[in-house]
Curated annotation (Swiss-Prot):
GO biological process, one term: cellulose catabolic process
Entry function: Beta-glucosidases are one of a number of cellulolytic enzymes involved in the degradation of cellulosic biomass. Catalyzes the last step releasing glucose from the inhibitory cellobiose.
Matching SMART domains: Fn3_like
EC numbers on record: 3.2.1.21
Molecular-function annotations in GO: beta-glucosidase activity
Protein family membership: Belongs to the glycosyl hydrolase 3 family.
Signal peptide: 1-18
Organism: Aspergillus flavus (strain ATCC 200026 / FGSC A1120 / IAM 13836 / NRRL 3357 / JCM 12722 / SRRC 167)
GO annotations of cellular component type: extracellular region
Domain of life: Eukaryota
Pathway connected to this protein: Glycan metabolism; cellulose degradation
InterPro entries the record matches: Cellulose_deg_GH3, Fn3-like, Glyco_hydro_3_C, Glyco_hydro_3_C_sf, Glyco_hydro_3_N, Glyco_hydro_3_N_sf, Glycoside_hydrolase_SF, Ig-like_fold
Protein name, entry field: Probable beta-glucosidase D
Keyword Acyltransferase among record annotations: no
Amino acid sequence: MRFVSLAVGAALLGAAGASSISSNVGLLKANGVALGNWEAAYEKASAFVSGLTTDQKLALITGSNVESTNGNFTPLYFLDGDMGLQDFYYVSAFSLSSALAMTWDRDAIYEQAKAVGSEFYNKGVQVVAGPTSQPLGRTPWGGRGVEGFGPDPYLNGLATGLTTKGYVDAGVIPGGKHFLLYEQETNRTSSFGSSGEGSPYSSNADDKTIHETYLWPFYDAVKNGAGAVMCAMTKVNGTMACENSDLLMKMLKTELGFPGMVWPDMNGQNSAKGSALGGEDYGSSSIWSTSTMESFLSNGTLSEARLNDMAIRNLIGYYYVNLDNGRQPTRQTTDVYVDVRANHSKLIRENGAKSMALLKNEGVLPLSKPRVMSIFGAHAGPIMGGPNSNVDVMGSGPTYQGHLATGSGSGMASMPYLITPYGALTNKAAQDGTVLRWVLNDTYSSGGGSSLVPSSTSSTAVEPSFENFATGSDICLVFINALAGEGADRTELYNADQDAMVNTVADNCNNTVAVVNTVGPRLLDQWIEHDNVTAVLYGSLLGQESGNSIVDLLYGDVNPSGRLVHTIAKNESDYNVGLCYTAQCNFTEGVYLDYRYFDAHNITPRYPFGHGLSYTTFHYSSLAIKAPSSITKAPKGNLTVGGPSDLWDVVGTVSARIANNGTLSGAEVPQLYLGFPDSADQPVRQLRGFDRVELSAGQEAVVTFNLRRRDISYWNVKTQQWMVAGGKYTVFVGGSSRDLRLNGTFFLWVGS
């Protein structure tokens, strides 16, 4: 949800039972976590809090100004989001996180985060409500999957960590969200009647699933400097996430060593006692009123140590990113002219092009000065009300009647402008002398006898229809999208109107290219095998430069290198997880999401996770594996910020030679997948490495993947540790989860 400051003014749900904790679990300096480079920030925060009265500490943790003998503190200002500042003028609209993940480019992910963070910093905003690791994408029907980095924990985790680091390096506090298991919009706040007692749904998952899938990316966030974490508005295993001490005090603050503050999503704080004891550190002054909290202190419900810990956690991120140095510009009202965009439009255009995946190409792309080109679909052009028209998915249809380049709710950017494909293609046609025709509608059939369309056969005018414009065109571009976002899940994974448009155009045009921008998996089987559908570009939402990014790819100014971050199935029924419509949402699929499920059940996808083509070709060879012959079963390192210190140690490497054996320069994304010994009870194979390597025609390079201890570990529910299984590991390197060109094995002997 949107945040404008540390002041929760939303209506809060009735009280519910809270988890209880032992006295010192999760408290800084009492939980056994070595703070490392957070130590100086802790000392500053602790010194400030030591001079506060109880009332001042309560003011601090409820977002009020604090004036003390130690100095003054103004409440932090929180704002969405990962795609750029909301509600401000003169800011950039970046690609959404799901698009950025499709670049599979560590540098691109980091540089965008640093650019976003710099705009927050220069606008006087202290906290980014992001990165958005979750929703992870448990179900393709989930409305907010577009805001995250995809359903693979490894890829999601690396992107989450790099984004966190980018924000920190820009001088702002990253606020990772949503913690935890928040995977759909349906019934996130709704009443279920007497059985649900007006509560949101409960996501119920076992310990192994939580650790190996949903908690995994938060390790990366914490390791890379997250100073805040937003607890979700829903329940986890029957307890509100913001009151769940197992999640917050045990897993997040102790196991992961998180030193920062936990603050609630809207409606996330349910009761004063439950949230205070459960692990929330910032709350509403109407719930944590002075009288209520002082009564908790006096009767022993809340300890002074816990209150001090809450106060310190509210400050530690501020000191960690050096916001106390006084250099940050003062925040102005949203419409005051403070232009913070720098040259970010160039970065947005480049990342947008890097992110789109070429799924199919039968030699039609790249384009070269076509004589007659027709474009079709509402997604090609602008919406009538402009790019900042409110994208409200609640009550809207499954598609957007204009070019979709940003999300909704917390995923919506403040557009300074929007380059549509129609606009960019018009400029290109003018340069090339191309005749350009268009129907910017998904269901248009004829001109209706308009007097503006002459009927004379000697005229060059053509009565506008899909059939008429497609006939005689050298190239036909059909633009389609899929809409969903905060507040509403998806109702379909394909669209009858758009699919009929593609088929109609393809029936009349032997070079039909489909351009798809979607909020999640979008089925293509209604037309993908049509003989005249000769190419498909597929991506997420690209931000203000969207049209330029797409045209750069269509004409070959950029060679496609994007890769899928989800599996595209042939049928909706191929996916194993749908939406949950009951109060209890049981994650019975465990760790088997997306390609892990498809592999386990030998389901053939239309396009696999990691797939993407290029205008050139690449050859893989020379697999080399360097792994230890033995390793301890469990990590032995100290508990640090980010978990046991040696969980992050590199314990082996895998390398392969990649050669560009085509005729054009391009970038390849080699991917490493790992198969575990049977005793680890893991999926068939899991992503455990990737790289993006740019190669000129004829050039080759050796790519090396580092295997960390955590990459070869599984969660042992009995010992409550990350453990390494002894036995045979199988290594696969290739271009997708199904395009596995090299393979090898290594054996590990595991000692105590």
